[in-house]
């Protein structure tokens, strides 16, 4: 999946910029610049055509209805024809194709609900919340709870202290046993568990999330993620999941548990895996820094994101949440269908601060899980870059 490409980088945060050729990976020690950008968010916005910020209710619904049509078509074909296949081998071929296709389209719908949480679906907040709540509830995501924590992520991106998800640990806080999990077989196991269980574990137990010093969950109204006035929204989110659970229970009683697992359960696992893979690779790269409170600011932190190429078909299925993530972090209320045009315009201002990596996705995932184990500031960073940067943390993997 994905094309070939390169990411513009700086070595150790200073010195001449080295462009990698097509198909090449990042060499050891190569890093993006961590200097404060010489432009403002308003300058970036002025470079983008104004119509890119306009939300169209009709156009947004057209993407949603297209996804619903595909989900319905895949379901109809699987439920109506798969049991008629003449040879058992065809069953083993047909079901994985269905699971992947259905899970991929559901990921696109998940992305539309995510846009609703950013008020990027329409000009009407109520419409956005109703649409987002219905979609996310049907795929077991607590809409308002996630909307709140995700807003915090956008407000604190790349802060080693305050970011909400995929927060890297310093070396001193790595589990003692992790050094035994750096071999290839263990890494395969970790990737598998992360993709299949990572999303529900994050929502339920805040695994890989910001450390709050006590139990944290998207389902707990008293969780430190939420303010007292937001607790009612957590209850509403949970009610949506209870309603979905009851609906699935009734379906299982009518159709059978096996039927429900095949038609809904496995595609849901594929959806969860896609969400984890996409979001992890948007913010994780061996060349990326994290900042503590002495170095972090909003623009600097939100520029530590990378666009990736999943290929023209999957980029379209995922509504380009994959290859327009940089501009999404800068302008989260921009509708996804304007992201490509806005990215082209923004790159003229961003220059070397825009990051794109065309490494094939599975190769990139393997590299990131291997190289991005923990973060530490460089002992000689000040001497290398000409300024004290002890608040800048870089990925390492030697335990």
UniProtKB/Swiss-Prot annotation:
A motif (Histidine box-1) lies at residues 114-118. It catalyses: a (9Z,12Z)-octadecadienoyl-containing glycerolipid + 2 Fe(II)-[cytochrome b5] + O2 + 2 H(+) = a (9Z,11E,13E)-octadecatrienoyl-containing glycerolipid + 2 Fe(III)-[cytochrome b5] + 2 H2O; (9Z,12Z,15Z)-octadecatrienoyl-containing glycerolipid + 2 Fe(II)-[cytochrome b5] + O2 + 2 H(+) = a (9Z,11E,13E,15Z)-octadecatetraenoyl-containing glycerolipid + 2 Fe(III)-[cytochrome b5] + 2 H2O. It is found in: Membrane. Pfam families: DUF3474, FA_desaturase. Expressed in developing seeds, but not in leaves. Pathway: Lipid metabolism; polyunsaturated fatty acid biosynthesis. CDD domains: Delta12-FADS-like. The keyword S-adenosyl-L-methionine does not apply. Residues 11-30 are annotated as: Disordered. GO terms for molecular function: oxidoreductase activity, acting on paired donors, with oxidation of a pair of donors resulting in the reduction of molecular oxygen to two molecules of water. It is an enzyme of class 1 (oxidoreductase). Its main location: membrane. Converts linoleic acid to alpha-eleostearic acid (18:3(9Z,11E,13E)) and alpha-linolenic acid to alpha-parinaric acid (18:4(9Z,11E, 13E, 15Z)). Converts a single cis double bond at carbon 12 to two conjugated trans bonds at positions 11 and 13. The histidine box domains may contain the active site and/or be involved in metal ion binding. Belongs to the fatty acid desaturase type 1 family. PANTHER family: OMEGA-6 FATTY ACID DESATURASE, CHLOROPLASTIC. This is Delta(12) acyl-lipid conjugase (11E,13E-forming).
């Amino acid at each position: 999946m994905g094309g070939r490409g390169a990411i513009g980088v700086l070595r150790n945060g200073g010195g001449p910029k080295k462009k990698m050729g097509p198909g090449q990976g990042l060499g050891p020690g190569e890093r993006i610049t961590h200097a404060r950008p010489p432009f403002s968010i308003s300058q970036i916005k002025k470079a983008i055509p104004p119509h890119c910020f306009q939300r169209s209710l009709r156009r947004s619904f057209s993407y949603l209805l297209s996804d619903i049509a595909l989900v319905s078509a895949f379901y109809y074909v699987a439920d109506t024809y798969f049991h008629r296949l003449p040879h058992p081998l065809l069953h083993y071929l047909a079901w994985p194709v269905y699971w992947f296709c259905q899970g991929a389209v559901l990921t696109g719908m998940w992305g539309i609900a995510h846009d609703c949480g950013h008020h990027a679906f329409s000009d009407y907040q109520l419409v956005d919340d109703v649409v987002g709540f219905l979609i996310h509830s049907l795929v077991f995501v607590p809409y308002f709870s996630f909307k709140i924590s995700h807003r915090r992520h956008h407000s604190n991106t790349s802060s080693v202290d305050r970011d909400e998800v995929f927060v890297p640990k310093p070396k001193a806080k790595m589990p003692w046993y992790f050094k035994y999990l750096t071999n290839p077989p263990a890494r395969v196991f970790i990737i598998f568990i992360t993709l299949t269980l990572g999303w529900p574990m994050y929502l339920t137990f805040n695994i890989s999330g910001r450390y709050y010093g006590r139990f944290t969950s998207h389902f707990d109204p008293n969780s430190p993620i939420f303010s007292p006035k937001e607790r009612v929204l957590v209850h509403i989110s949970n009610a949506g999941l209870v309603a979905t659970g009851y609906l699935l229970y009734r379906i299982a009683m009518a159709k059978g548990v096996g039927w429900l697992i095949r038609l809904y359960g496995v595609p849901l696992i594929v959806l969860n895996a896609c969400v984890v893979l996409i979001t992890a690779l948007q913010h994780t790269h061996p060349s990326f820094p994290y900042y503590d409170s002495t170095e972090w600011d909003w623009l600097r932190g939100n520029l530590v994101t990378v666009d990736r190429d999943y290929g023209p078909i999957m980029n379209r299925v995922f509504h380009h949440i994959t290859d327009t993530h940089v501009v999404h972090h800068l302008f989260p209320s921009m509708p996804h269908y304007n992201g490509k045009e806005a990215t082209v315009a923004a790159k003229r201002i961003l220059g070397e601060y825009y990051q794109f990596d065309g490494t094939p996705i599975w190769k990139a995932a393997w590299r990131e899980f291997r190289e991005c184990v923990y973060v530490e500031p460089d002992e000689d960073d000040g001497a290398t870059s000409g300024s004290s940067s002890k608040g800048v943390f870089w990925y390492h993997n030697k335990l």
